[in-house]
Design a protein with these regions (language model features):
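Glycine-aromatic micro-motifs
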Residues: 1-248
């Protein structure tokens, strides 16, 4: 009898995609740099891929299962190098919009002096087109624009020590949510985020229910309701600029 492959996403506990399980957002991610090969994670033998486009993964695009889902749905190759990086000058906040996927996603903001760890994905042209479409880059009313951040603005250091001249990142066109004191609110994970947002807004509860589970169930697939939630973030004064608008 053939032994099961220990390198599959299922075997590694990384098979759950936030697109199918919104409360799992941003999704589980690897502990180290890997090569995503469809349903498997393989050792990554090189960190620089000059024939591909470097894209920082701020939210669920660092989740192998989410990437697998997006590529498989579009019939595009699911082989993607994923490199762990240290990023200087960028923070991870909360998008000022409700996604029809059923969650409130992450979005970057300008954070001089900040240092954090993010995955960088190296995408080929077809993969980049898939991710662009999934983020709404190609439509005027889409949630995100894709921005190029040069090393003079945001420094990206690969886990092998190389510094990149720059990288792309998806910036939310509606800004990010603030923490009540004028600073961007960090994304704590979907369940605690939704619980806090619902507790703080009676109008949000009217639209999406009392619990994170109700929020996800109502939001998922209902673009009109999500648009109302997005407008509510703005009308209640919860949104602020990310500081990255000039790049997108």
């Amino acid at each position: 009898m053939t032994e099961p492959d220990p390198r599959t996403l299922e075997a590694l506990g990384l098979a759950e995609a936030p697109r199918e399980h919104p409360l799992s957002y941003p999704g589980a991610r690897p502990e180290e740099s890997v090569l995503l090969d469809g349903d498997r994670l393989l050792p990554l033998t090189r960190r620089l891929c000059e024939d591909r486009v470097p894209v920082l993964a701020v939210g669920s695009n660092a989740c192998p299962a989410q990437l697998r889902h997006k590529m498989a749905q579009s019939g595009v190759s699911g082989t993607i190098p994923m490199v762990k990086t240290r990023v200087f000058g960028l923070g991870v906040g909360v998008s000022a919009h409700v996604s029809p996927m059923g969650y409130v996603s992450a979005s970057p903001f300008h954070a001089p002096g900040a240092v954090g760890e993010l995955f960088l994905t190296w995408l080929d042209a077809a993969q980049l087109a898939v991710v662009d479409a999934s983020e709404g880059v190609t439509v005027a009313e889409g949630a995100y624009g894709r921005a190029w951040l040069s090393a003079s603005d945001v420094r990206v250091e690969l886990d092998s020590g190389e510094l990149l001249p720059g990288a792309h990142v998806y910036v939310n066109r509606r800004g990010v949510l603030h923490n009540g004191s004028g600073s961007p609110r960090p994304h704590p994970g979907e369940r605690p985020l939704l619980a806090s947002l619902l507790a703080g807004s009676a109008r949000l509860r009217e639209l999406f229910g009392e619990t994170p589970e109700e929020f996800c169930a109502r939001a998922r697939g209902d673009g009109a309701l999500c648009a109302r939630g997005t407008r509510l973030f703005a009308s209640e004064g919860l949104a602020m600029a990310s500081g990255l608008e000039r790049y997108a």
